[in-house]
Amino acid sequence: ENRTDTPAQSRTVPFVVGAYPMLPPDDEGRSGAAALYAALGDLGWVDGIELPFREALDAPEPWLAEQLAGRFDQCVITAIPGTMGRAGADPVFGLASPDDDGRAQALAYTRSLLEAVDRLHEAAGEQLVTRVELHSAPHHQATPEAFHASLSELSEDFASRGLGMIVEHCDAEGGVGPSEKAFLTLAQEIAACRDTAALITVNWGRSVIETHDPSTPESHVRELVETGLLGGVMISGAGPEETQWAWAWADAHLPLAEHEPTSWLTPERVAATMRAADGAQVYEGLKINTPARASLEDKLAWVSRVRETMLGA
């Protein structure tokens, strides 16, 4: 396959926007969310929305179906909000848990997510979601053997629905500084995904949180390209100082440094990460925070600027 024309080829890769950090606060009646989804659809290059799953999707399935149908057919569900909530309450909860009950709870949780996808598709009358991002919880005690078992056990649940199984790498146990997630290392996740249908997604900010080294996302992407396991490349920032969104080194989806000076996410680093993927990614996208009172126009401008830096590779 010829991958020399990277910008042209990258346009054929589904582009996903994690819009949930940008949703307006106090959004009575969800009118702000509806306007954001419509505006993202009107951009013409957003193929899917990354939707968070906590104990449910963040809006009723019929409402979401109305916003997404006819606009986005490459949506991704991320299990990270619910996984973090459950793992915070139960230290053995997770798909990579060495505790049988904790792993069983995580399998049941994941299947409840898949049932929500079924309801969303039923309401829409079409397939909107193509991939689901899973995570190697629990904190501090995850094992690749348990994670492999879970991914294997879920394979039929995913295949029967035509859904791609994605492992989204987060900061690993043994990283630099106080950890945010302390899940499995990338090498352990690669081992866990072997002989399964799972691919692995790199989130720029989450890889940087692990090492406090802005070259880590690029090296993580290269490693996954070499092993044939690269799923997605998601661009999302991180940084060493407290911001309007969160504390230092939080998983706060910081925007580009030109919009948030403490963010380590620069156009050059984005371009280097995209070059490392070399067109091997099965999807790509971005997830950034914007100020709570940002206008819709400003949100679209910030999102468009990140995409511009991705295409600049």
Where are these regions (language model features)?
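A structural signal for the main folded, soluble domain(s) of proteins
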Residues: 3, 17-49, 147-165, 186-187, ...
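Acidic-and-aromatic substrate-binding clefts and catalytic sites of carbohydrate-active enzymes
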Residues: 23-31, 50-64, 140-144, 173-183, ...
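A cross-domain feature marking catalytic cores of carbohydrate-active enzymes
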Residues: 19-21, 51-55, 75-82, 134-138, ...
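Histidine-acidic metal/acid-base catalytic patches
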Residues: 2-7, 111, 115-123, 149-150, ...
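N-terminal pre-domain/capping segments
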Residues: 1-95, 100-112, 203
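Acidic (Asp/Glu)-rich catalytic clusters
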Residues: 6-11, 34-45, 58-84, 115-127, ...
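Short acidic/His/Gly/Ser-rich catalytic and metal-binding motifs that mark active-site loops
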Residues: 84-91, 174-175, 242-246
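Active-site acidic/histidine proton-transfer and metal-coordination neighborhood
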Residues: 91-195, 298-307
